[in-house]
């Protein structure tokens, strides 16, 4: 390898490492957003957004352009009921899951897509609390300012919000039924050594492909509860 070829390879490796570091930083940023959103921590949420002319947050309540508008939303909420967010039983969990991130070639901007899923608890004026589940998609644009990745544009698209007892399909279309599990082992599409499946929590532990990252020990998955007895 010539000195020139070696220099080119080093340059290429530096670019690859930088891209991986950018992706890691963006993941950290997005996950922090989810944790702050759980309790509507307005100051922390606002800090994650870039101070930029393109800064934008788009949700069902509307489009909030500029960092100041984003800050007003997080401080006041959609209807100005700040007391609700400070209620000890308020919960707005939106786990940031399955992120797919693409960094621009110049390393200054990026885009990401995430699932948002979690449990909610919204205190009501009558003293009761409205629990539910929510699921949606985030499409996010990021920008690097001063070497720090920040949120530039966040779009939240709700897929469903379901009250705790009603499920996430319309009542008139809902039909509760049990799946036939475990499936028929004689089914030609399922070999006899296929993994176990259960309808309810049963003590079944899905096998791990990896060993313990600290001890290197293979994880024991043979421990199960059956008929009230522990089986090894």
Role assignments for model-derived ranges:
Residues 132-137, 157:
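Conserved helix-adjacent loop modules within structured domains
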Residues 116-120, 142-144:
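Beta-strand elements of well-folded, non-transmembrane domains
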Residues 97-101, 137-143:
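Hydrophobic/aromatic beta-strand elements that line small-molecule binding cavities or substrate pockets
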Residues 42-118:
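A solvent-exposed, acidic/Ser-Thr-rich amphipathic alpha-helical stretch
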Residues 22-38:
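Short, aromatic-enriched amphipathic alpha-helices that serve as compact interaction elements
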Residues 1-27, 145-232:
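Terminal "cap-and-tail" regions of soluble proteins that handle hydrophobic small molecules
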């Amino acid at each position: 390898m010539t000195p020139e070829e070696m220099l080119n390879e080093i340059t290429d490796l530096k670019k690859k490492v930088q891209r991986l570091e950018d992706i890691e930083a963006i993941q950290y940023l997005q996950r922090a957003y989810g944790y702050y959103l759980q309790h509507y921590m307005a100051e922390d949420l606002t800090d994650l957004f870039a101070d930029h002319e393109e800064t934008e947050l788009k949700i069902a309540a509307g489009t909030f352009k500029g960092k100041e508008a984003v800050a007003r939303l997080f401080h006041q909420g959609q209807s100005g009921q700040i007391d609700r967010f400070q209620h000890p039983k308020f919960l707005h969990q939106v786990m940031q899951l399955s992120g797919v991130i693409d960094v621009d070639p110049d390393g200054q901007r990026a885009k990401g897509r995430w699932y948002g899923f979690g449990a909610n608890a919204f205190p009501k004026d009558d003293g009761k609390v409205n629990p539910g589940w929510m699921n949606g998609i985030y499409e996010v644009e990021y920008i690097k300012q001063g070497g720090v990745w920040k949120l530039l544009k966040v779009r939240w698209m709700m897929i469903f919000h379901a009250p705790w007892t009603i499920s996430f399909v319309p009542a008139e279309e809902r039909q509760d039924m049990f799946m036939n599990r475990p499936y028929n082992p004689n089914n030609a599409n399922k070999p006899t050594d296929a993994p176990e499946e259960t309808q309810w929590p049963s003590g079944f532990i899905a096998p791990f492909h990896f060993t313990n990252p600290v001890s290197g020990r293979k994880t024991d998955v043979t421990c199960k509860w059956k008929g009230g007895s522990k089986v090894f």
